[in-house]
């Protein structure tokens, strides 16, 4: 245990995802040794992201305006929506340059163990977008893990009565993995080999 401010910093850093006690301590001591101007830049970046960044009113992606840049882009294909769990998945798919449609970010995945059900996700917003009638295909690009598969199955069953083409990214993505960590080639091939879901 360290005194006051140092221990408080370590504790707060340790609350970040993927940062354990040892990493929190290393980061804290790095910040203590850093130039004051460097620490101020970090603080300003943290404050700016909280003040300026919001979620897109259309798709749920991160944005600094009411709509994200993808929703504002008139060159995107309005007939295809790719459903992902988190904004980081949009970034991963965009890196492939394979997809030119629109996105819908759910804000997570169905996880009974974590107490997350369909009502906790942006499913109603997805259904509202689809009811507008422009979309002909929905690509379910949830993570290839238990929660992602449960979410994709739930959505496929929900969408079936709408008569839309519902596809899932092809295998090639490791089961239990996250889209964020897939390389561009693997993710690109998964897009090319997506398959229809029949439930």
From Swiss-Prot:
Cysteine disulfide partners in this protein: none
GO molecular function: DNA binding; zinc ion binding
Domain of life: Bacteria
Entry-linked Pfam families: RecR_C, RecR_HhH, RecR_ZnF, Toprim_4
This protein's record includes keyword Manganese: no
InterPro entries associated with the record: DNA_Rcmb_RecR, Rcmb_RecR, Rcmb_RecR_Znf, TOPRIM_dom, TOPRIM_RecR
Toprim domain mapped to chain residues: 79-174
Zinc finger regions, C4-type: 56-71
Keyword annotations: DNA damage, DNA recombination, DNA repair, Metal-binding, Zinc, Zinc-finger
Gene3D superfamilies membership: 3.30.60.80, 3.40.1360.10, 6.10.250.240, RecR Domain 1
SMART domains assigned: TOPRIM
GO terms of biological process kind: DNA recombination; DNA repair
Function: May play a role in DNA repair. It seems to be involved in an RecBC-independent recombinational process of DNA repair. It may act with RecF and RecO.
Similarity comment: Belongs to the RecR family.
Name of the featured protein: Recombination protein RecR
